[in-house]
């Protein structure tokens, strides 16, 4: 089985969100299983391994009425072959997205993915495209390449990491920039706009999301950002596969960022030492209180409005809070002020610090993740890995990965409705459970034993790839 994984970002080369983690981990897990999985992505200006790249060739890529240069470079990393597509006009910029011509940039990239195959001795069985930045790959394949021998058996899978970002532009972009004539514009047109993601829904052989629950949620108008009717029509080719995490990078036994390494065998001593160090760092009291933590972007979608509503109530219960993140000014201001008002009980760090994030995973007792919507989420899995039971809302991948321990065997605490009352109730249950030390230690051990490795998810993808390759 030959897989070409097309993504606009991949760790460790370029990252703005969870897509990069998936693109950096899933192909590696597939290769370990004997799949010939390769990654293709843009060569951004910030990529640091240019001295390790091998130049392959260069060629022209159609972009509307003109052609643009594309350079092809190759590298091996962790056993995976990476192809980097170079065009300094489009990709040598500070940052990955947010430019006025993003539609043109990723129309070029999508077309270049297919043009690149003419210059490789590698023809994939499946091209796995990801999010709107590669959504035009199956569109272009069906319109301009399917009749060619090299392409006529290639199948496509489109993975939705977050349906909120669809690649929506004015209709004038289609012919002039994307090179899609008026006869075919209906494939990409939706609700009076050019919608790249809609084009992938129409033309890809399969559609996946990053968790089974999210695959069901996006059929509902509340979660779909306007695409629910189309997705219900395409439901026959939609499925959800839960993401995994890199178990080596997130390993409390070897993590150099934390003050005391530990495993299931000695988590009591390890967690206690990491908690004490975390409390010292944030000036919190060491009085036996549980520490509840958040590591997240400070936006409403992550449930910060709920946390804001109950924060003082949690502190009054005797819970200490640690918050790491940045985002909307109203939340940055509130939690900074909360730390000032409740010294010794609340610690806030505005910004992001990866080492500190790992220290929080290791040192906290519970991890808060009350998201309004969460396609998959990785933080709750990392928290389990470090023996920090999560408190999550039952949505998307949170529902698929965390089971409520108060209902029997579970690895955390859950609540269903998006309300401050239900979050507060879940926190109270967690707080009460914390003081039952024997059962709490069983919960921590159970959470640490959960297998969220990519090897599990890779098996599901391999099944999907085989099924898709055998279509017609």
What would you call each of these model-derived segments?
Residues 1-472:
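Catalytic cores of nucleotide-sugar-dependent glycosyltransferases that transfer UDP/GDP/TDP-activated
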């Amino acid at each position: 089985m030959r897989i070409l994984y097309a993504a606009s970002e991949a760790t460790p080369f370029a990252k703005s969100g969870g897509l990069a983690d998936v693109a950096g981990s899933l192909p590696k897990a597939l290769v370990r299983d004997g799949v010939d999985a390769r990654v293709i992505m843009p060569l951004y200006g910030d990529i640091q391994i240019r001295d390790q790249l091998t130049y392959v060739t260069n060629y022209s890529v159609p972009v509307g009425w003109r052609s643009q240069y594309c350079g092809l470079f190759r590298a091996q990393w962790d056993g995976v072959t990476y192809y980097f597509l170079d065009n300094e006009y489009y990709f040598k910029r500070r940052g990955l997205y947010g430019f006025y011509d993003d539609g043109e940039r990723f129309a070029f990239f999508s077309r270049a993915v297919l043009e690149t195959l003419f210059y490789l001795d590698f023809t994939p069985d499946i091209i796995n495209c990801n999010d709107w930045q590669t959504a035009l790959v199956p569109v272009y394949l069906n319109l301009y390449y399917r009749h060619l021998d090299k392409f006529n058996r290639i199948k496509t899978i489109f993975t939705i990491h977050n349906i909120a970002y669809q690649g929506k532009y004015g209709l004038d972009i289609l012919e002039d920039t994307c090179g899609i004539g008026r006869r075919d514009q209906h494939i990409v047109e939706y609700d009076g706009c050019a919608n790249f993601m809609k084009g992938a829904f129409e033309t890809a052989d399969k559609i996946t999301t990053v968790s089974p629950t999210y695959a069901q949620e996006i059929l509902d108008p509340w979660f779909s950002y306007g695409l629910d009717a189309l997705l219900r029509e395409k439901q026959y080719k939609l499925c959800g596969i839960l993401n995994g995490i890199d178990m080596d990078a997130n390993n409390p036994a070897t993590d150099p960022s934390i003050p005391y390494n530990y495993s299931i065998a000695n988590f009591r001593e390890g967690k206690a030492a990491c908690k004490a160090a975390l409390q010292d760092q944030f000036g919190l009291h060491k009085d036996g209180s549980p520490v509840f933590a958040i590591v997240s972007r400070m936006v409403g979608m992550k449930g910060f409005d709920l946390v804001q509503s109950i924060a003082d109530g949690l502190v009054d219960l005797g819970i200490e809070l640690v918050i790491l993140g940045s985002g909307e000014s109203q939340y940055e201001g509130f939690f900074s002020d909360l730390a000032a008002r409740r010294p010794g009980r609340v610690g806030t760090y505005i910004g992001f610090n990866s080492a500190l994030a790992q220290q929080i995973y290791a040192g906290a007792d519970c991890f808060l993740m009350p998201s309004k919507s969460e396609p998959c989420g990785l933080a709750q899995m990392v928290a389990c890995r470090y023996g920090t039971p999560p408190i999550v809302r039952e949505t998307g991948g949170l529902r698929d990965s965390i089971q409520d321990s108060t209902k029997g065997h579970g690895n955390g605490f859950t609540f269903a409705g998006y309300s401050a009352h239900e979050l507060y109730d879940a926190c109270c249950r967690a707080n009460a459970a914390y003081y039952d030390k024997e059962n709490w230690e069983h919960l921590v051990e159970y959470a640490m034993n959960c297998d969220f490795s990519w090897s599990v998810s890779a098996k599901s993808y391999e099944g999907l790839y085989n099924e898709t390759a055998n279509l017609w």
